[in-house]
A protein has these predicted regions:
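Conserved catalytic core of two-component sensor histidine kinases
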Residues: 15, 42, 49
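Compositionally biased non-globular segments, especially hydrophobic aliphatic-rich helices
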Residues: 10, 39-42, 114
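N-terminal single-pass transmembrane signal-anchor helix
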Residues: 1-29
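Regular, well-ordered alpha-helical segments
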Residues: 23, 31-34, 50, 54-57
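Periplasmic/extracellular, small/polar-rich flexible segments of pilin-like filament-forming proteins
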Residues: 46-122
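Aliphatic-rich helix starts adjacent to a transmembrane/signal segment
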Residues: 28-45
Length: 122
């Protein structure tokens, strides 16, 4: 007798393998989305440095409100900017993650940023 097709055991093995692959891939995908959100926040902070320096070149001071001169990426909340004696600090958050990113220019650090002009997230 010539039977064509798959046995129940073969089909169960395929389903188990697909389940294992999905269990590995889904957490990695979620981590990739988190990295993308952090990258967009860092990019916005780097762009903020450029906008602040352009404002400083015109006005010889930093500002807490750049108005239409600066726009954030979709989903990024902020920036919250504070001027200091010799610079400024800023932080942003994202609507889909609990992490925040900060940057500072001058001598007044804002956690988690610990190097001037370099955005850092926590």
């Amino acid at each position: 007798m010539n039977r064509k097709g798959f046995t129940l055991i073969e089909l169960l093995i395929v389903v188990v393998i697909i389940g294992i692959l999905a269990a590995i891939a889904i957490p990695k995908f979620a981590n990739t989305k988190e990295k993308a959100y952090l990258a967009s926040m860092k990019s916005d902070l780097r762009n903020l440095v450029t906008a602040q320096e352009a404002y400083f070149a015109d006005s010889v001071k930093y500002t807490t409100n750049l108005g239409t001169a600066f726009a954030t990426t979709s989903g990024v909340v902020g920036p919250t900017i504070a001027t200091t004696a010799d610079g400024w600090t800023a932080w942003v958050s994202h609507t889909t993650t609990t992490k925040t990113c900060a940057i500072y220019v001058g001598s007044t650090a804002l956690a988690p940023a610990n190097k001037e002009g370099e955005p850092k997230c926590q």
